[in-house]
């Protein structure tokens, strides 16, 4: 019953909206921690609660506890303090009880209290136990507009950020205070605090068009809390990577990380875009491949020829030494070579591309458990 009450497919976002209204009324200071538009927050929180209640119903606690601990650590960047968790507990309990008043009894009350004690207790405890700063700031030192919709942004951080190659971090830009976006570093962690991001302007988006169109050297960004677990097991066999556009970033970070060792599994990277000119990082990939024989790179574009606007941006024609450029959609191009079932498979890019590529590989016979990708939005 608790799960159904918060399920967005069953109208649960209305309850979440009521919860936030009550929370802000109980604790006025909380409202200033969130962006003005909370529509996306309602959806995300509704989905998270639905999953958490479902896991508890099925008596699975390990993943929910890990998720809640990460959530608690992550909320430190918003300025959430211990007192906010107590007001959150009160608001959520009161909202659930009001929503389910017709069915509320002692058993449901005990269940709700136990669940909320777990949810909020784990978050509060994890946040309190975290010793490091909740975020680190950095200065944009270089901006390269490598295509009409893509920018490469390099920053110098005030202090090094702890993350692993292949992870993504939350980023806040000065034009959009209190709004955080996930971006994947395109390089392994640097002891001197250098970091690089590849950003594509998404039509209808708020933050990515600003980053691509308005970012200037000297801008101050705020970064926090790495997430994600994409990785390469150097003893786990050869590797297939499929990167769509700026989805290249975390895969390139993993490739660069592998260059620390002399012996590695073979890695075959398919790097795709709409047009040849959007394969913006081919020169870097060629440089890495020329010095590391375990790396193969296949450039792929949906269209064979570039549009007229390509003349305004750097030439990224594949240099000699890379595989022949291929035309087509990534799922079809990748799977025409087989199912790659003997490989560790990593896919990164837009949700539609990731889903289509994963489904195509599984349909060909690739084991689903061998496929890694970050959580899909939407």
Report the location of each language-model feature.
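Reductase modules of NAD(P)H-dependent flavoproteins
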Residues: 9, 270-378
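Phosphate-binding glycine-rich loops and their immediate beta-loop-alpha structural context
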Residues: 241-242, 246-261
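A short, basic/flexible loop-to-alpha-helix module at the beginning of a structural domain
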Residues: 225-236
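Core of compact, soluble alpha-helical bundle domains
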Residues: 1-136
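Ferredoxin-reductase
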Residues: 132-220, 237-238, 273-274, 300-304
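Structural motif
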Residues: 238-240, 268, 344
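Short, conserved phosphate/pyrophosphate- and ester-handling motifs at nucleotide-, phospho-/glycolipid
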Residues: 166, 247, 350
């Amino acid at each position: 019953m608790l799960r159904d009450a918060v399920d967005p497919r069953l109208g649960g976002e209305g309850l979440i909206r009521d919860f936030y209204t009550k929370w802000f009324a109980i604790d006025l200071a909380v409202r200033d921690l969130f962006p003005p538009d909370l529509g996306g927050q309602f959806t995300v929180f509704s989905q998270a609660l639905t999953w958490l209640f479902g896991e508890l119903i099925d008596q699975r606690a390990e993943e929910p506890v890990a998720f809640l601990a990460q959530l608690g650590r992550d909320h430190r960047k918003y300025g959430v303090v211990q007192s906010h968790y107590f007001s959150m507990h009160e608001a959520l309990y009161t909202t659930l009880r009001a929503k389910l008043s017709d069915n509320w009894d002692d058993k449901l009350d005990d269940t709700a209290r136990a669940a909320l004690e777990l949810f909020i207790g784990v978050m509060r405890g994890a946040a309190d136990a975290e010793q490091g700063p909740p975020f680190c700031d950095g200065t944009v030192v270089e901006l390269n507009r490598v295509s009409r919709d893509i920018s490469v942004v390099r920053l110098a951080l005030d202090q090094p950020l702890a993350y692993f190659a292949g992870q993504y971090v939350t980023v806040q830009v000065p034009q959009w205070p209190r709004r955080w976006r996930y971006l994947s570093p395109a390089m392994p962690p640097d002891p001197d605090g250098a970091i690089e991001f590849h950003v594509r302007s998404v039509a209808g988006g708020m933050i990515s068009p600003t980053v691509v169109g308005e970012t200037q050297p000297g801008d101050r960004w705020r970064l926090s809390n790495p997430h994600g677990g994409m990785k390469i097991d150097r003893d786990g066999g050869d590797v297939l990577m499929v990167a769509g556009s700026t989805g290249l970033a975390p895969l390139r970070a993993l490739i660069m990380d592998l260059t620390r060792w002399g012996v590695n599994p073979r890695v075959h990277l398919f790097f795709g875009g709409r047009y040849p000119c959007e394969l913006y990082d081919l020169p870097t990939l060629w440089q890495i491949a020329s010095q590391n024989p375990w790396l193969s790179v296949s450039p792929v574009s949906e269209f064979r020829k570039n549009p007229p606007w390509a003349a305004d941006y750097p030439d990224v024609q594949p240099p000699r030494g890379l595989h022949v450029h291929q035309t087509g959609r990534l799922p079809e191009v990748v799977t025409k070579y087989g199912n790659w079932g003997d490989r560790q498979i990593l896919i990164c890019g837009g949700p539609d591309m990731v889903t289509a590529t994963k489904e195509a590989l599984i349909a060909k016979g690739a084991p689903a458990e061998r496929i890694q990708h970050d959580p899909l939005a939407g």
